[in-house]
UniProtKB/Swiss-Prot annotation:
Belongs to the actin family. ARP4 subfamily. Residues 55-64 have a biased composition (Basic and acidic residues). It holds the Pfam family Actin. Gene3D superfamilies: 3.30.420.40. It comes from Arabidopsis thaliana. This is Actin-related protein 4A. Residues 47-66 are annotated as: Disordered. Expressed in roots, leaves and flowers.
């Protein structure tokens, strides 16, 4: 039975410890995973690294510039030489937008298994977020979705 208020809006909360994503109107988020990203600089990657990655890690990795980024519990728990665990936020403010895009992409594509262009989006943000951070967040979400 259709209640009339059922929309397929996606709610994303990128916290300093965990990222939570799910559908608006549901009691609990569908995806809860660490909001940290594993990063390997371009000079730290070797040929054997690509052969040792699991299928889940390959799906959630993204190469940005000269570093390879890994997001999600399975990708982070897989041992890789010279991988550094980094947080995209500091004191609740986003400091690395490439990492945030990687976290959002993991939430949409791997956890929720949706195309973000087909859903309205609600992003949680810190109450003391600056206007510049708010604009960057909206810009990034608008152009990637």
């Amino acid at each position: 039975m259709y209640g009339g208020d059922e929309v397929s809006a996606i709610v994303v909360d990128l916290g300093s410890h965990t990222c939570k994503a799910g559908y608006a109107g549901e009691d609990a988020p569908k995806a809860v995973f660490p909001s940290v990203v594993g990063a390997i600089d371009g000079n730290g990657m070797d040929i054997d690294d690509a052969a040792n990655t699991t299928e889940d890690a390959k799906e959630s990795d993204k190469e940005k510039g000269k570093r390879k980024l890994y997001t999600g519990s399975q990708a982070l728990n897989f041992r890789r030489d010279q991988m550094e665990i980094l947080s995209p936020t500091k004191d609740g403010i986003v400091t690395d937008w490439d990492m945030v895009d990687n976290v959002w992409d993991h939430a949409f594509r791997n956890c929720l298994m949706i195309d973000p262009t087909e859903h309205p989006m609600l992003l949680a943000e810190p109450p003391l977020n600056s206007q510049q951070q708010r604009e960057k967040s909206g810009f990034s979400t608008f152009y990637r979705c």
